[in-house]
Every structure is written in C-alpha cells, then in structure tokens.
Amino acid sequence: MIQQRVIRYIEKEHLFLPDDKLLVALSGGADSVALLRVLHTAGYQCEAAHCNFHLRGEESNRDERFVRQLCQKYGIRLHITDFNTTQYATEKRISIEMAARELRYNWFEKIKEECGAHVIAVAHHQDDSVETMLFNLIRGTGITGLLGIRPRNGAIVRPLLCINREEIIRYLQQIGQDFVTDSTNLEDEYTRNKIRLNLLPLMQEINPSVKNSLIETSNHLNDVATIYNKVIDEAKTRIITPEGIRIDALLDEPAPEAFLFETLHPLGFNSAQIKDIANSLHGQPGKQFVSKEWRVIKDRNLLLLETIRPEDESTLPYQLIKEEREFTPDFRIPREKETACFDADKLNEEIHCRKWQAGDTFIPFGMTGKKKISDYLTDRKFSISQKERQWVLCCGERIAWLIGERTDNRFRIDETTKRVIIYKIV
C-alpha cells in the first residue's frame, strides 16, 4: 500500500519524527494532493501552503478554490498568498520558472517559522528525480547533478521519492480523490516538459524500464558521491587557504579540473569557464573569470576568489585622521604602516586621495630615484586584487603616500622641519 511505503521511506531517510508539525506545499495538482492525503491519513500534524502565481488566468484561481475546499473538508489549516510573478521575474531579470521557485520557497520558509513547522514537505516523486537527472545531464553537470532529487535539502523534505507518478494517480483513484490539472504540464512549453513528453518516451522505446534503470543508477551514484565528496573535502584542506586556491597543490592532485568544478560550480561558474580556469593554471598571472557574484583571478601562485561588490572609486574604504603639530626635538616618527608623517611646509598643494593608476611614480622614503608604483607593488608581492585596492594620498599631482605602505621621500621630515602633519588610518 502506498501509505505504508511512504511511511517506511520517511523513517528510513529520517525525514521527520511522528510528532513533528509539517508544512505541506499544496498546488492542487495530483502529486501535492496525494502527499497531503497520505500524510494526513497517516496521522501526521499537517498545515498546507498554496501560492497563487497568477500565471494561468482563471486556472490559477480555480486551483486556489480547489485547495480551499480540500483543506476545509479535512480540517487542515491553509496558508495562501498571491504573487505578481511576471513583475518579479522582470525586476530580477530571471525566468518565470526561476521567479516562481524563488517566491515559493522564500514564502514557505517564512510560513514555516510563523506556524512552528519542523519541515516543509514537497511532492517530488521518482519521475521528477529522473527528469532532473536528464535535465542536468543535458545542461552539463558534475557527479552531484546526476544524483537526481535527494530526500532532504535543509528543511525541505520529499516523502514521495519512493513512488512514481503512475502509482500516485492510481492511489488517488483508489481513494476517490480528485485534483486539478495544470494545462502547462500537457504542453510542450518548458524544458522539463520536453524531457517528460518527448525525450523519455523515446528512451522507453529502447528500454521500457529506463526510469527504473535511472533510479538504480542514481542510488548507486549516491554511494559513489559519498566517497567522492570525502576525497574532495580532504583535498580542500590541502589546497584552499584563506588567501585563495594554491596552484601548486592543485596541480599535485590527480584531477585538478574536477576539484575546480566542485569548488567553483556552486559559485556560479559554468563548465566552459572552469575549463578555461584550469587551462590558465600554467599561464601568466592577470587573467580574470567572472560569475554573477564571484571573481577568480589567476595570480602568481594562487587562484584568488573574491565576491563582486560595487565599489565607489571616489570614496576611501577607510578613514584618515589628520593631526598637525609643532616639530620638537623629542618627536618620534611612528613606525606603523598605518601612520604617515610629513613636513607640513612641503605639503603645499591640495591634498586628495585616489586609486593608484598605471604610470604612477613616487620616490620611496629613503631613496633618491623614482619608482613605478606597479613595480613597487610587484616587488612587495602584492596580489592582483591587493593592487586593485591600493590607494594613494596626493599633494597636487605628486604622490605623497602609498597609503598603508610607504611615504614619498620628497615630503620627509628633516632638520629644517618646523611643523609636522600626521595622517593615520582608522
């Protein structure tokens, strides 16, 4: 019986405890209705949550009416919300499918906290898992993407992964439970529906049991992934430092590109980018690779990883405090790099700060000849990202201080100094 199989699966996968409160995602379709009926009949404490995305006109409102009647019939508390999905997708510049997913799961999490539910139960089943495997395979994926849908992801649990779509329909027929049909599921409109309606039937002509074969493969790969992920995690301790990914240690691994994929793919880098990053490991420093939120920079010995933040090029990322005082025989020049001392009379033009630029030069303190700032930073073994964040304090057109590093010898304190100006980073 379906109900007993689902209960055994819940216990086997440790999805939740008998006394836990469940928030069931209820669209009104066959899968979610079956999930609610199975859990409610089994005695679990359920509340339901329904989203009206207003994407299918009257159909969307029909679905809402149906779930209201269903929950009222069985005395199940129902939470309902409305979304302007099209507007959200336009504002976020994402697909309608992605917009609906983000809106749905963000709201589910909010309702879960408000009602005190322990988990959010969603109605993915074996056929969904097969379609996910194929979808990821077509798009390009690593071993994790070939595992299909997993029983648990944080607070999201999937009790129906032990049964398929055909069994769900048969269960609903046996208990005399109706449901609503989403017309888009019958149209060749979205990628997943192309897999469901076109690709899988072709595969079944070759192997009528292809769905079962893929589920068995997924279960086998799950065991393989456990070993694989353990090896990747161990490698991370050798390769990743607070500064970045050590290129020499990475190249000592048997499969550097696989390691890069598992590290960078979750950060939004696609397979082609990761291959380019792997090819850059033996090249010159300076190459940059960008995902939506992250940047990888090929430096001399490291791959630098940093989040992309919009920067105000005209505003210092720290504060400078200025102090002016008489120069006396007992004055001691501070040694900290965060502090710079100048002869006040030599700072005789407008003082301003900016990012250093290509071609900038200064005379480092204690020297007599000019040096390019780019060469100075290279000699100091600054990484590319550190160079990009370096600011200078200028007196007119001349650089007086490579901030936090070294002052210019032309503004030094000497025996003729009467007043000193001190700048300090805070």
Curated annotation (Swiss-Prot):
Lineage: Bacteria, Pseudomonadati, Bacteroidota, Bacteroidia, Bacteroidales
Function: Ligates lysine onto the cytidine present at position 34 of the AUA codon-specific tRNA(Ile) that contains the anticodon CAU, in an ATP-dependent manner. Cytidine is converted to lysidine, thus changing the amino acid specificity of the tRNA from methionine to isoleucine.
Enzyme Commission no: 6.3.4.19
tRNA processing is among the record's keywords: yes
Name this protein carries in UniProt: tRNA(Ile)-lysidine synthase
Presence of the UniProt keyword DNA damage in the record: no
Molecular function GO terms recorded: ATP binding; tRNA(Ile)-lysidine synthase activity
Cellular localization per UniProt: Cytoplasm
Gene: tilS
